[in-house]
């Protein structure tokens, strides 16, 4: 039953799984065992949607499930192993936008399922449901930035990507120490310990990347929160497009492991 009802998402799952296994084999022979470990982690993450559906009896629409699968593949295999983060400057931005959308979908689903449960005395209006969905997504985004910052500080990673800027403003440059920002414009060269970095500008160490990530996470969260608000307020009134992105509880009489 599950595969028959989710033909498109199952096909995507199979294709992505085959690609990940192929990459894992290739990286194994190349001696890149860190990439092999990342492939194994990706294979486990690709199982997450199916695990949620079977374990918690939640019906994930095929469209949402495909987005989750593609997101995992794009982030881990394309982004990390294939270096798409470096090849395509917008790659990180696109993924953080998707993350905001997906996190909002998760937050919305959790509360909406409680709203509709007969065993829980809990009910929120469509507006508050959308607000909770938005706040959940933004919290996930902020916690992720905390994680990136911690990895950079404790282990010397560069998860908060750097950016080259050509102007800065800082009160630390104020010779009078009067808390007045001093502006430096048209920066084309920066030297560290007497050595030119050759960047053509000033190196910003993560602030711009962090703020861009949170801004696009905000956009993704707003988009799904609006979708969720419209869906709940007009539930059952022909909103078939929106329903493709909103999880719902499975019926109790269904065999969750049947293939036909």
Where do the PLM segments sit?
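Short, highly charged, low-complexity non-transmembrane loops/tails of multi-pass membrane proteins
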Residues: 238-259
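Alpha-helical transmembrane segments of multi-pass membrane proteins
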Residues: 46-50, 71-76, 133, 137-144, ...
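Membrane-interfacial alpha-helical segments at the cytosolic side of multi-pass membrane proteins
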Residues: 98-115, 153-159, 219-233
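Membrane-interface helix caps and helix-loop-helix hairpins in membrane proteins
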Residues: 28-33, 55-58, 81-91
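Interfacial helix-loop-helix junctions of multi-pass membrane proteins
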Residues: 81-92, 138-224
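Cytoplasmic-side transmembrane-helix entry/capping segments in multi-pass membrane proteins
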Residues: 40, 59-70, 93-96
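N-terminal membrane topogenic signal
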Residues: 1-16
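Membrane-interface helix-boundary motifs at transmembrane edges
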Residues: 3-4, 52-63, 119-124
């Amino acid at each position: 039953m599950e595969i028959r009802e989710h033909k498109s998402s199952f096909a995507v799952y199979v294709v992505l799984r085959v690609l990940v296994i192929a990459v894992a084999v290739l990286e194994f022979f190349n001696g890149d065992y860190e990439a092999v470990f990342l492939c194994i982690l990706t294979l486990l993450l690709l199982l997450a949607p199916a695990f949620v559906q079977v374990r918690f009896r939640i019906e994930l629409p095929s469209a949402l499930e495909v987005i989750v699968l593609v997101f995992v593949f794009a982030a881990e295999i394309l982004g990390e192993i294939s270096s798409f983060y470096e090849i395509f400057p917008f790659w990180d931005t696109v993924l953080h936008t998707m993350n905001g959308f997906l996190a909002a979908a998760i937050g919305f689903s959790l509360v909406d399922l409680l709203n509709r449960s007969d065993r829980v005395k809990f009910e929120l209006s469509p507006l508050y449901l959308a607000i909770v969905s938005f706040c959940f997504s933004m919290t996930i985004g902020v916690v992720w930035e905390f994680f990136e910052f911690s990895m950079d500080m404790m282990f010397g990673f560069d998860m908060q990507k750097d950016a080259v800027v050509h102007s800065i403003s800082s009160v630390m440059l104020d010779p009078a120490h009067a808390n007045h920002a001093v502006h430096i414009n048209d920066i084309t060269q920066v030297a560290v310990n007497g050595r030119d970095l050759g960047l053509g500008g000033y190196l910003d160490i993560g602030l711009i990347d962090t703020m861009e990530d949170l801004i696009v996470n905000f956009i993704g969260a707003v988009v799904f929160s609006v979708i969720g608000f419209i869906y709940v307020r007009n539930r059952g009134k022909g909103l078939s497009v929106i329903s493709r992105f909103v999880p719902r509880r499975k019926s109790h009489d269904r065999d969750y492991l049947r293939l036909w």
